Amino acid sequence: MVSFSSVAKRYPGGQEALRDLSFAIGEGELAFITGRSGAGKSTLLKLIPAIERPTSGSVIVKGQNISALKRAAIPYLRRNLGLVFQDQKLLYDRSVYDNAMLPLAFSGHAPKEAARRVRAALDKVGLLGRERSNPIQLSGGEQQRLAIARAVVNRPSLLIADEPTANLDAESAARILEIFVAFNQVGVTVLIATHDQGLVARYGKRVLHLEKGRVA
């Protein structure tokens, strides 16, 4: 599903975010990426949907080499990915329903099918009763659940999340992770970056711990 082979990522000025990074995530797997702030977790996740490209090495996602992927092909790659980043980019002038609908508006789904998918996604994250609300009316945990609903409305085979429980209380954080576990249980591959070792320890799943851009 996802394979990194001798991947390095360097930024202008010489900052090396990742170095000689190799690992593979199998189809249907749930894995956590842990490490301190600055360890390279966010950079790693951004390479998967080609938000950034590796400086060297290969990143293979669903059989496609990210380094060789043409710019025009990137939107097609991302249609099969669910992305939950720290900057949720929710539209605060639109309803919860409209926010969840956004990915489908770009993919040409028939209106009835799109509406069915949106309601199903909101139901899975416990927001079906809030579909007419504005995101500003939601709690931090509810806003994160809305971001997840938007990420899964296209029924992705791979779901990646960068610090999805950051700034949430313990109860909300646990609920967010349970949502990811539930998607994994129906076959979705899930990759989560987090610094919360306590939450990770509860699940007994594979952990990739990064230190200075490498798997420790």
Task: Set out the residue ranges of the language-model regions.
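A short, proline-enriched helix->beta-strand linker immediately N-terminal to the Walker B motif
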Residues: 153-157
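Helix-to-loop junction immediately C-terminal to a conserved catalytic motif
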Residues: 49
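Catalytic Walker B motif of ABC-type/P-loop ATPase nucleotide-binding domains
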Residues: 159-162
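Conserved ABC ATPase signature
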Residues: 134-138, 142-144
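ABC ATPase NBD coupling module
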Residues: 12, 66-82, 185
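Conserved ABC transporter NBD signature motif
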Residues: 57-65
